[in-house]
């Protein structure tokens, strides 16, 4: 098999820097990470200094993602030799058991870590991930709520809890979690958009109005979000068609829906400039919007 350095004419420093970029930006290009990382470890370990250990960890996790347990185990053994008794390395052992679906073995490791260090957040999250993998959502929700009582500022945990509530069709609690996220990160368009989707799903005039407002705010924060644009259109259409809506409310929402329609068509026209099937794509969008047109009530 050809070396990465030969194929792409790169130095070991280039490969080391690329691994660092992938690590810091949370890339999940696992096969590339394994290929580049393996070559670095096998041929340039002595030049890497202490960086070699974080690369071992990075390659191990990527190898689990690719189903390469042989590489994962090799990396794990090196880390165990270098850091005997390390909670971080023990957690990697648990990750390997998870990849093998040996969940009870993984849980035993995580429980031992938490006995020594009850505040180990990464390990607590792994236990919750196992509950999800086993389809035990009620337990995952309970443990996440307990976790958030101690670590209320953990945005990742709030979002995970929102997703679990959505899966359980508990939209009111999902909306509460998303509101917490909006409060802590008011410039993230995705949270506004997801909150709007939850409110749209709940239905009813009041929820639809909230949905439209939050889709609008998502668009203000990211005017390229087609999902928010379609959401604005759909929520406006449903409000304008709602028999409980006032005449003014219906008139206003017809305007919002019309504006959203024009923006959607414009976006598809711009995106289609380099496409050979521009007219076909645009016609499909127009037909879809036509089927969703506002009907008098």
UniProtKB/Swiss-Prot annotation:
GO terms for cellular component: cytoplasm; EMC complex; endoplasmic reticulum; endoplasmic reticulum membrane; extrinsic component of endoplasmic reticulum membrane. Coiled coil: none annotated. InterPro entries: EMC2-like, TPR-like_helical_dom_sf, TPR_EMC2, TPR_rpt. It is found in: Endoplasmic reticulum membrane. PROSITE patterns: TPR, TPR_REGION. GO terms for biological process: protein insertion into ER membrane by stop-transfer membrane-anchor sequence; tail-anchored membrane protein insertion into ER membrane. TPR repeats lie at residues 87-120, 155-188, 192-225. It is a peripheral membrane protein. Keywords: Endoplasmic reticulum, Membrane, Repeat, TPR repeat. Part of the endoplasmic reticulum membrane protein complex (EMC) that enables the energy-independent insertion into endoplasmic reticulum membranes of newly synthesized membrane proteins. Preferentially accommodates proteins with transmembrane domains that are weakly hydrophobic or contain destabilizing features such as charged and aromatic residues. Involved in the cotranslational insertion of multi-pass membrane proteins in which stop-transfer membrane-anchor sequences become ER membrane spanning helices. Belongs to the EMC2 family. This is ER membrane protein complex subunit 2-B.
């Amino acid at each position: 098999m050809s070396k990465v350095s030969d194929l792409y004419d790169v130095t070991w420093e280039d490969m080391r820097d690329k691994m660092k970029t992938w690590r810091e930006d949370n890339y999940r290009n696992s096969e590339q990470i394994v290929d580049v990382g393996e070559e670095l470890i096998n041929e340039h370990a002595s030049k890497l200094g202490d960086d070699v250990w974080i690369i071992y960890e990075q390659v191990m996790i990527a190898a689990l993602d690719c189903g390469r347990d042989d590489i994962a185990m090799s990396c794990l053994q090196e880390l165990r030799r270098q850091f005997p008794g390390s909670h971080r390395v023990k957690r990697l052992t648990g990750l390997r058991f998870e990849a093998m679906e040996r969940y009870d073995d993984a849980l035993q490791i995580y429980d031992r870590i938490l006995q020594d260090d009850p505040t180990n957040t990464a390990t607590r999250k792994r236990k919750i991930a196992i509950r999800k993998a086993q389809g035990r959502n009620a337990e995952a929700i309970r443990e996440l709520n307990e976790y958030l009582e101690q670590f209320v500022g953990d945005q990742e945990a709030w979002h995970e809890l929102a997703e679990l509530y959505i899966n359980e069709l508990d939209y009111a609690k999902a909306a509460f979690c998303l509101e917490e996220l909006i409060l802590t990160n008011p410039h993230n368009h995705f949270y506004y958009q997801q909150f709007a989707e939850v409110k749209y799903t709940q239905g009813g005039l009041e929820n639809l109005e909230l949905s439209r407002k939050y889709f609008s705010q998502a668009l203000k924060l990211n005017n390229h979000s087609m999902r928010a644009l379609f959401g604005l259109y759909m929520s406006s259409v449903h409000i304008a068609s709602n028999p409980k809506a006032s005449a003014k409310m219906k008139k206003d929402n017809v305007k919002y829906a019309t504006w959203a329609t024009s923006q959607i068509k414009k976006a598809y026209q711009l995106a289609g400039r380099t496409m050979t099937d521009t007219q076909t794509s645009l016609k499909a969008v127009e037909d879809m919007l036509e089927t969703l047109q506002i009907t008098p009530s």
